[in-house]
A protein has these predicted regions:
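Surface-exposed, charged secondary-structure patches
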Residues: 83-131
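Short, cysteine-centered beta-strand-loop-beta hairpins and adjacent loop/turn segments enriched
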Residues: 127-141
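Short beta-strand edge/turn micro-motifs at domain boundaries
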Residues: 121, 139-168
Length: 168
């Protein structure tokens, strides 16, 4: 796994995470719809996800960046938590907002470790802004370990993505 490929894989996976968890923050003026008393935005309005209109299609798309079973687990959790809803042939994502300083932070790929048998671990340093600070002065840095291996198609994919939990 070359560094440039690892960076590209992490960037794509992180962008997908932003799409699924921070859609409300980046709505671009789109008006939410109310489904079952909760506000949602159509996932199809989110750029590169514009041809995805079902949870199954999203799982297939995620399979380029995440192991199939892990992608399925993430989407199942999103549907269960009502962050993701299929309605009238359209896939909607919750119009959620997050704490004011949670958007301010960054990351850096520090290291690629061999884990044996064609598996790797990306060591990524994540940092977050201090509470209420929007000037990019970071209060905490944390190393997070992301396991990577090849899928059946021979593509490197994440078998877990701890950023999903720690960055929320």
């Amino acid at each position: 796994l070359h560094e440039a490929d690892a960076r590209r894989l992490f960037d794509k996976a992180r962008s997908l995470w932003l799409s699924l968890y921070l859609q409300g923050e980046y709505a671009g003026g789109k008006k939410p719809v109310t489904i079952g008393g909760k506000s949602y935005l159509p996932l199809a309005d989110w750029g590169y996800l514009n041809n995805i209109n079902s949870a199954e299609a999203l799982i297939r798309y995620m399979g380029h960046y995440f192991a199939a079973e892990y992608a399925g687990q993430l989407i199942h959790e999103a549907v269960t938590d009502r962050r993701l809803v299929e309605y009238n042939g359209t896939l909607y994502i919750a119009d959620d907002k997050i704490a004011d300083n949670a958007l301010y932070g960054g990351y850096s790929l520090k290291e690629i470790r061999k884990a044996g048998e064609g598996k790797y671990v990306l060591v990524v340093e994540i940092w977050k802004a201090a509470a209420g600070d929007k000037k990019y002065t970071y209060s905490a840095k944390e190393e997070i370990f992301f396991p990577v291996e090849k899928n059946a198609a021979g593509e490197f994919v994440f078998t877990a993505f701890p950023y999903w939990d720690t960055a929320r």
